[in-house]
Design a protein with these regions (language model features):
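Intrinsically disordered, low-complexity, charge-rich segments with an acidic bias
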Residues: 3, 21, 25-61
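An alpha-helical support segment within catalytic cores of ATP-dependent transferases
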Residues: 99-114, 231-290
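Juxta-kinase regulatory segment immediately upstream of eukaryotic protein kinase catalytic domains
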Residues: 2-5, 70-73, 77-118
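ATP-binding pocket architecture of kinase catalytic cores
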Residues: 120-234
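A glycine-centered beta->alpha junction motif in the catalytic cores
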Residues: 188, 193-209, 228, 252-260, ...
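ATP/Mg2+ or Mg2+-diphosphate-binding catalytic cores
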Residues: 3-5, 70, 368-414
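Active-site acidic catalytic loop and adjacent metal/ATP-binding pocket
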Residues: 126-136, 143-144, 276-321
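Active-site activation/catalytic loop segments of kinase-like enzymes and analogous catalytic loops
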Residues: 320-350, 360-378
Length: 414
């Protein structure tokens, strides 16, 4: 999960010691080194690849290679709304850390005309990813994303393909919100960066939304527009595509794995199994799914949704996966406003079991969190997940998630 920006509506900036000229001067020497290394990499690549290899950057017919990992729901954060996570893979050794100045230098090589002058928000760092903001000499605000593992690098590249395609939809005026635009990337032996435009706005305060035509309706509209996107946005970007039955079977597999841990209340296992075996619940038309909706990925300004980011887990699947976050986070009195705006944005209407599946996804995300703890041997995560599962079991008791249909009998002739 990316960290929420710590800035207000206007982008914050941080001058390094010496101010603008200092950063520009220091970046210059790093740029020369980055250009030299990039040149070496290009020469090596030209020797290794056929000279007639086509470039995909500007080819409209280019179809990105299918990305096997990460699948939707592979996040190592507390679960929100994504599909089941795959088995944990052995951890990679992160690449060496690069300073903000080095990243700025590489960005100036990756994007022609990008001459950074000062640092800006966001500034976040994890063992797998480093993100910095910079302002260039033209006043443009950029984000530099450094991937420190191959898995994160693959995720960045896959997300870039999705962003390029959604960006075209935005430019055609068919979306009411913006997305980050990928301006360039640079891959070297010990570094992999991607440069994106910075999208303005603050994380949506979903827990304090109010009913009515403001942000609640704006959130519903944005979700509906996401689910109306052409599925080719995902399939041509090489991201996963699941039909309704595949979605159901993936959740069933997660249920089996959860039961095998012996840490889940039996009443919950029965509740989930009943819902997953109810075939009527799983008759839906797959849509584009964002896959990682959270406050920090939905940005607002002026009382409306202005941008959506964090598309690395996008896929085609069950729209209930996105709505699970809404139903578990938004105030109850806002749900009608969100749903009404969502319904209006959907051209073919909404299937009648969408809300029930969203509730199921929300509950199963706790099971996914438990499995993450078990697979990584993280006892605090296991204990946290077990506690949440026990709380949920106490809340729902023996009630089924979906009430079985009661057959209607004809009146007995009197």
């Amino acid at each position: 999960m990316s960290q929420p920006p710590q800035s207000p509506d206007a982008p914050g900036t941080t001058d390094v010691d010496g101010g603008v000229d200092s950063l520009a001067d220091e970046v210059t020497s790093d740029v020369e080194r980055a250009e030299a290394q990039a040149g070496d990499e290009d020469n090596h690549q030209q020797q290794a690849e056929p000279s007639d290899q086509r470039s995909d950057e500007h080819d409209e017919d280019y179809r990105a290679p299918v990305v096997v990992a990460p699948l939707p729901g592979a996040s190592a954060e507390p679960p929100r709304s994504s599909a089941p996570a795959p088995q944990a893979q052995p951890a990679e050794t992160p690449r060496p850390r690069h300073t903000a100045l080095s990243l700025a230098a590489m960005a100036s090589v990756a994007v022609a005309g990008l001459n950074p002058t000062r640092l800006a928000l966001p500034q976040s760092e994890t063992p797998e990813r480093h993100i910095i903001g910079v302002i260039d000499t033209q006043g443009r605000h950029w984000e530099i994303h450094e991937a420190r593992t191959d898995a994160v690098g693959a995720s960045l590249e896959a997300e870039a393909e999705v962003l390029r395609r959604i960006g075209r939809v935005v430019d055609d005026g068919r979306l009411s919100f913006d997305v980050p635009r990928v301006a360039g990337s640079l891959r070297q032996k010990d570094a992999h960066i991607q440069v994106r435009s910075h999208v303005e706005g603050k994380p949506i305060p979903v827990e304090t939304l109010r009913p009515g035509p403001g942000m609640s309706a704006g959130l519903g509209k944005a979700l509906g527009e996401i689910h109306e996107l052409s599925m080719t946005v995902i399939s041509e970007a090489g991201m996963p595509v699941y039909d309704a039955e595949e979605v159901r079977r993936r959740w069933l597999s997660l249920l089996d794995d959860t039961a095998a841990t012996g840490r889940t209340p039996p009443a919950l296992l029965g509740r989930w199994e009943q819902a997953l075996e109810d075939t009527a619940l799983w008759r839906f038309r797959p849509t584009v799914v964002h896959g990682d909706l959270a406050e920090e990925n939905v940005l607002v300004a002026g009382g409306t949704v202005v941008a959506v980011r964090g598309w690395s887990q996008a896929h085609v699947g069950d729209p209930a996966e996105d709505l699970a976050w809404v139903y578990s986070s938004a105030p109850v009195d806002c749900l009608d406003s969100i749903e009404d705006a969502y319904d209006i944005a959907r051209s073919e209407g909404v299937d009648r079991h969408l809300r029930e599946r969203a509730e199921l996804v929300s509950e199963l995300s706790l099971a996914r969190w438990l499995l993450h703890g078990v697979r990584t041997g993280d006892k605090p995560v296991i204990n946290d997940a077990v506690a949440m599962l026990e709380d949920l079991a106490a809340q729902v008791g023996d009630a089924p998630l979906v009430e079985p249909a009661t057959p209607r009998l004809a009146p007995v002739p009197g």
